[in-house]
A protein has these predicted regions:
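Accessory, often N-terminal, substrate/partner-engagement and coupling regions
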Residues: 21-22
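Glycine-rich, aromatic-flanked loop segments that form ligand/cofactor-binding clefts
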Residues: 25-32, 148-152
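Amphipathic helix-loop-helix modules that constitute alpha-helical solenoid scaffolds
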Residues: 31, 37-40
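Extracellular/periplasmic, surface-exposed regions of secreted and cell-surface proteins
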Residues: 1-16, 39-98, 108-325
Length: 325
């Protein structure tokens, strides 16, 4: 590492710190046995052990529940209806505590603790109606359906500082701190949903000539009003040449198929839930400093650049291929 202006080092992480820290540098301060040693020949040294101590009380726990179920109804000889529902739910609990004595950062914060709990649930509902019909050498399949996805995320966080240095680590959680009016709580919630309508028609003759047409319409709450719906068709055709009479007696060809297709797909991955809306930050005031017990939050600056033309990213693909086996 390189010492900069005698105030610190440009080291990052425990591994690099372990490599660059002199082996003869003391770990504990001789004058304060409960504190890690920092003053190494005028440099503000942070030992690897101190870096590790900052996370001694950190905990991260994730519980996940996956459920799915469905029903299939045979409405007629060639007509079926299938309805499925699935749920993916996660509960995350993260907590941290840094005592006010051992580490230099803990002393500047007078000890600090945080606790964050979040609940993330995603539901998917699918309903598909399928009609199959075969006659002579013809085979026809028609499918129509809907798919809906909803997602709700919620998070509550709290933090405290000013922990007792007399009874160190006695209460390593939020209850042991005293903020004295400093805001240390936050809450967040976001929701989004997608509604899709699906259709497909597939036809083949004698398993040699195959044609498929697909269409889907997707509407997303992440996109701006008036631009939320996208329409994406696709088509494909194939000719199984190996099924023709002039190749049936060729023993070294099991399958030979010429295929071609064109289609469009929509993408909204990476978009925030409310990117099309103008968002603002919130200013909070410490009433103990302003001497105003009635101090209330005010609207701050802009948090994003709104885009009221936000819509689907549409990509088109064309493919032609020859399958041989």
């Amino acid at each position: 590492g390189t010492i900069i202006s005698g105030q610190g080092a440009n080291r990052a992480g425990v591994v690099v710190s372990a490599i660059t820290t002199p082996t003869y540098a003391p770990i504990w301060d001789p004058e304060n046995p409960q504190q890690f040693y920092n003053n190494f020949y005028g440099a503000n040294l942070t030992s690897p052990r101190e870096n590790m101590a900052r996370t001694d009380y950190n905990q991260d726990v994730t519980d996940r529940l996956l459920l799915s179920g469905g029903l299939t109804f045979y409405l007629a000889k060639d007509l079926t209806f299938k309805s499925t529902v699935s749920m993916d739910r996660r509960w995350v609990h993260s907590s941290s505590f840094l005592d006010p004595i051992r580490t230099s950062y803990g002393r500047t914060q007078h000890g600090t603790a945080s606790d964050t709990r979040s609940d993330d649930m995603r539901m998917i509902y699918d309903n598909i109606l399928t009609w199959n019909k075969s006659f002579d050498r013809h085979s026809l399949e028609v499918m129509a359906g809907t798919s809906a996805t909803t997602s709700v995320w919620e998070q509550l966080s709290g933090s405290r500082s000013y922990f007792s240095s007399t009874n160190n680590n006695a209460i390593p959680n939020l209850n042991g701190g005293n903020n004295g009016g400093v805001r240390g709580q936050s809450y967040g919630k976001s929701e989004w949903s997608i509604m899709s309508y699906l259709a497909r028609v597939s036809y083949n003759y004698d398993s040699k000539y195959l044609v498929t047409a697909n269409f889907r319409a997707d509407g997303s709450s992440k996109l701006a009003p008036g631009h939320r719906w996208g329409y994406f068709p696709s088509f494909s055709a194939a000719w199984r040449i190996s099924g023709e009479k002039f190749l049936r007696d060729v023993s070294w060809i099991n399958d030979l198929k010429l295929r071609a297709g064109w289609g469009q797909t929509g993408n909204q991955a990476g978009l925030a839930e409310y990117g099309w809306m103008q968002q603002y930050s919130t200013n909070y005031y410490d009433w103990t400093l302003t001497e105003n017990a009635q101090a209330v939050p005010t609207v701050g600056g802009r948090k994003n650049i709104k885009n009221q033309d936000l819509t689907w990213e549409t990509s088109s693909q064309t493919n032609v291929g020859l399958d041989f086996a």
